[in-house]
């Protein structure tokens, strides 16, 4: 039986910690495809496609000797293409399903699919000459399972209030760092552990995710902190008052009730409802403003549209470098010259493999740097108050002696939505500056400088996902979060398809020289500053509106009688 939302709230730290571990070892593990490809080739997957006369390489273990060829790699990469496509393209339907049914069923399905994926790979490795086609189904299930686990974990930060963006960044960081998983698995494989044992063990661990979800994840979705209070409520004559209600807020409620009593006398049949009703207290209405926002308004909002441009451009920049990195390193080492001797070829290959391994290890930086951008998104949120509304009393004003009829001294508060926009501006500006710095590092043909490019690439890859997730959680209703995030991921994946054309241009007409492609992408990177620029404009407009509504408290008390 699924736990209640209240029970899940008490277990939120356990759920968050286990979700980070689960994302790290079970989400986007296909991003470490290079290591998995080596293991699959050693196990002999599609080795039958390699005729003896076309043999390009031979790998040998204690019992078998398998051949390797271009046809084998093309077939295996086709499986990777399918799996990686599902890893990104299914985000939109998953977002719609999660908004409708909550994260629990999707997480159960995802963990089951991951276990099935590992089991299929283990079974197929027993007789690769016959069962090699199972790798397509296994990789497809792996990609689908990864996005299910990742997507559902992004709802957990809603239970952490003002730290929501920080925990969301931690979830995205563990997802981005999962590229290190297959390189780690390969180390175990190289130590002599059979591939079948590794896959069956991994499948068993995935079953623990299923069990953890069944025991701890509630059936309903996690509402945003602005939409529900997970903490204990105190019932008072049919009215749910938060135990943290401030004196000013209670004074506002009593004033409104007093104004209602001055207009009519309640009958006995009306009971206590005539004196006290939940809508009189700000933030306790049954239907929150966020719930009433139509999805079309969120979809067509300028913030979402500009985020599509920024995220699509950044995704293209990041994915192109991941796909073309080996060729870029090779061009830097050789200077564009042909390798004439076997010794030169071997030296180039060793250098490229060394730097590629460094790049793989650096993926763990995502786990360390993503919380930083989340901290930026959460900066000073806990010190903020809700926005004022026209014709109502500002809860966080300093009333002084207003209740005694004396002059009122007014204090301008810091509003939550304005602060969230400020934090988003800072986060996206920092990310875009790092992206431009990464582009400049790519233009310089220096091998050691590529280490800086590795660091900047890894940080940007974690930052821009975390910043976007924090922005969506801060600006849009929580019931739109899954669909909007899924749509953004799908459109970004379409943008990323252009990297294949850029790669073909680099190895074809440009003869392996990445300079012009990197220059074009660097210029394109400046489009990323359009989103924080619009957020700055939107924040200024919002501040003017708040300043207009921020009227004198005594005037509000006098005019509220007319409103009632």
UniProtKB/Swiss-Prot annotation:
The modification Phosphoserine is found at residues 262, 267, 398. Its main location: membrane. It catalyses: D-leucine(in) = D-leucine(out); L-leucine(in) = L-leucine(out); L-isoleucine(in) = L-isoleucine(out); L-methionine(in) = L-methionine(out). One of its GO terms (molecular function) is neutral L-amino acid transmembrane transporter activity. One of its GO terms (cellular component) is plasma membrane. The keyword Ligase does not apply. Expressed in the kidney cortex as well as liver, pancreas, and skeletal muscle. In kidney expressed in the glomerular tuft (at protein level). Expressed in liver, skeletal muscle and pancreas (at protein level). It comes from the Eukaryota. Keywords: Amino-acid transport, Cell membrane, Endoplasmic reticulum, Glycoprotein, Membrane, Phosphoprotein, Transmembrane, Transmembrane helix, Transport. It is found in: Cell membrane; Apical cell membrane; Endoplasmic reticulum membrane. Glycans are attached at residues 54, 57, 396, 558. Induction: By nutrient starvation. It is a multi-pass membrane protein. The chain crosses the membrane at residues 20-40, 78-98, 105-124, 131-151, 165-185, 191-211, 303-323, 357-377, 424-444, 451-471, 490-510, 515-535. InterPro entries: MFS, MFS_trans_sf. GO terms for biological process: isoleucine transport; L-amino acid transport; L-leucine transport; L-valine transmembrane transport; negative regulation of L-leucine import across plasma membrane; neutral amino acid transport. Belongs to the SLC43A transporter (TC 2.A.1.44) family. Uniport that mediates the transport of neutral amino acids such as L-leucine, L-isoleucine, L-valine, and L-phenylalanine. The transport activity is sodium ions-independent, electroneutral and mediated by a facilitated diffusion. This is Large neutral amino acids transporter small subunit 3. It comes from Mus musculus.
């Amino acid at each position: 039986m699924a736990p209640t939302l209240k029970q899940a709230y008490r277990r939120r730290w356990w759920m968050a910690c286990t979700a980070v571990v689960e994302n790290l070892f079970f989400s986007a593990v296909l991003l470490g495809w290079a290591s998995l490809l080596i293991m699959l080739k050693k196990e002999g997957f599609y080795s039958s496609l390699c005729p003896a006369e076309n043999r390009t390489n031979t790998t040998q273990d204690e019992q078998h000797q398998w051949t390797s060829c271009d046809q084998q790699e093309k077939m295996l990469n086709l499986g990777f293409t399918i799996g990686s496509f599902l890893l990104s393209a299914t985000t939109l339907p998953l977002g719609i399903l999660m908004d409708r049914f909550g994260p629990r069923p999707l997480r159960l399905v995802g963990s089951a699919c991951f276990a099935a994926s590992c089991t299929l790979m283990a079974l197929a490795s027993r007789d690769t000459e016959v069962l090699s086609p199972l790798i397509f189904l296994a990789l497809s299930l792996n990609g689908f399972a990864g996005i299910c686990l990742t997507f559902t974990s992004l709802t957990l930060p809603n239970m952490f209030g003002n730290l929501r963006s920080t925990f969301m960044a931690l979830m995205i960081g563990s997802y981005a760092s999962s590229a290190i998983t297959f390189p780690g698995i390969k180390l175990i494989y190289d130590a002599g552990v059979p591939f079948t044992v590794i896959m069956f063990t991994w499948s068993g661990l995935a079953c623990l995710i299923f069990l953890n979800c069944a025991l701890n994840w509630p059936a309903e979705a996690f509402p945003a902190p602005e939409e529900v209070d997970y903490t204990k409520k105190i019932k008072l004559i049919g009215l749910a008052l938060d135990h943290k209600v401030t004196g000013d807020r209670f004074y506002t409620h009593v004033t409104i009730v007093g104004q209602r009593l001055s207009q009519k006398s309640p009958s006995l049949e009306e009971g206590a409802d005539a004196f006290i009703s939940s809508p009189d207290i700000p933030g306790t209405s049954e239907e929150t403003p966020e719930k009433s926002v139509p999805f079309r308004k969120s979809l067509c909002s300028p913030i979402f549209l500009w985020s599509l441009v920024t995220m699509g451009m950044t995704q293209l920049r990041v994915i192109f470098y991941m796909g073309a990195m080996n060729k870029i390193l090779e061009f830097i080492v050789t200077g564009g010259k042909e390798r004439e001797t076997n010794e030169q070829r071997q030296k180039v290959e060793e250098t490229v493999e060394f730097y590629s391994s460094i790049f793989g290890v650096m993926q763990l930086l995502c786990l360390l740097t993503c919380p930083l951008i989340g901290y930026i998104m959460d900066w000073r949120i806990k010190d903020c108050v809700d926005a004022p509304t026209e014709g109502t009393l500002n809860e966080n004003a300093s009333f002084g002696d207003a209740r005694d009829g004396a002059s009122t001294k007014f204090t301008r508060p810091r509003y939550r939505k304005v602060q969230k926009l400020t934090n988003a501006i800072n986060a996206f500006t920092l990310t875009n500056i790092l992206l431009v710095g990464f582009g400049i590092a790519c233009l310089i043909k220096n091998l050691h400088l590529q280490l800086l490019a590795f660091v900047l690439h890894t940080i940007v890859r974690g930052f821009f996902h975390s910043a976007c997730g924090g922005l969506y959680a801060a600006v849009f209703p929580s019931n739109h979060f899954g669909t909007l995030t899924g749509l953004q991921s799908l459109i970004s994946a379409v943008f990323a398809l252009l990297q294949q054309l850029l790669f073909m241009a680099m190895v074809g007409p440009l003869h392996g020289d990445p300079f012009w492609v990197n220059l074009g992408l660097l210029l394109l990177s400046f489009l990323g500053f359009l989103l924080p620029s619009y957020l700055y404009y939107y924040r200024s407009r919002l501040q003017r509106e708040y300043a207009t509504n921020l009227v004198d408290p005594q005037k509000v008390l006098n005019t509220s009688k007319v409103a009632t």
